[in-house]
């Protein structure tokens, strides 16, 4: 597993250890090309091969489109799209393609499937997640002959560092008002979907976007 902060990784490693799971970690900043290369080098050195890749790094920025800083736009695109491409490219070329096997799981968002009102001010985030959706489908078509499946999870509202401000500002009642299941996601709700895409239970599923959103997109699609 990997993220920017070693302290967070150590904590996660210890948590998994209490459950009898042996985990290794590599600290890396996926917004930096050199860190991505080092991450792949170190992971292959530790593991020998990489069969499952979960592209989970992401960032957002809130600003009106007409005043959106170009630096902020580039930051979101660099982490949410460019790093995902580079990591998939390197792991595919160096491990999955030679081994004729791979499971790639990209974290998209329902924000990448539709527009949003001016209240959200997340033009860069929405655009980047739309790119993740297209990337997932394109890569699935391109790498299918190598035995590699590529799918994406598209979460709705989940509590996280990224959404904390929105939850506090908007309030839980408003956030769940349009959700058929009348709740936002919790820490368990993505696990089963991720396990499906990571396992051979999904060996004939590729290029798919699975919404984990309590039914939000189902309601929007029918309206």
Model-derived segments and spans:
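Substrate-binding pocket helix/loop in short-chain dehydrogenase/reductase
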Residues: 36, 64-65, 69-74, 175
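Alpha-helical segment proximal to the catalytic Tyr-Lys
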Residues: 93-94, 141-142, 203
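Short, small/polar-rich loop/turn modules that mediate ligand/substrate recognition or access, typified
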Residues: 144, 149, 205-207
């Amino acid at each position: 597993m990997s993220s920017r902060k070693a302290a967070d990784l150590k904590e996660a490693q210890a948590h998994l250890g209490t459950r009898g799971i042996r985990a290794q970690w590599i600290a890396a900043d996926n917004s930096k090309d050199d860190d991505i290369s080092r991450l792949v080098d170190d992971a292959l050195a530790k593991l020998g091969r990489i069969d499952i890749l979960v592209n989970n790094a992401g960032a957002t920025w809130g600003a009106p489109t007409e005043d959106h800083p170009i630096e902020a736009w580039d930051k979101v695109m660099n982490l949410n799209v460019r790093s995902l491409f580079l990591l998939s490219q390197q792991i595919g070329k160096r491990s999955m393609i030679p081994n004729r096997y791979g499971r790639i799981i990209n974290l998209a968002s329902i924000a990448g499937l539709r527009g949003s009102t001016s209240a959200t001010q997340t033009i860069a985030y929405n655009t980047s997640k739309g790119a993740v959706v297209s990337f997932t489908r394109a890569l699935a078509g391109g790498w299918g002959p190598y035995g590699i499946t590529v799918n994406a999870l598209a979460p709705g509202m989940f509590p996280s560092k990224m959404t904390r401000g929105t939850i506090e500002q908007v309030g839980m009642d408003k956030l769940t008002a349009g959700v058929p299941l009348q709740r936002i996601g919790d820490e368990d709700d993505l696990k089963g979907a991720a396990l499906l895409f990571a396992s051979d239970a999904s060996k004939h599923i590729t290029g798919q976007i699975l919404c984990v959103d309590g039914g939000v997109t189902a309601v929007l699609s029918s309206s």
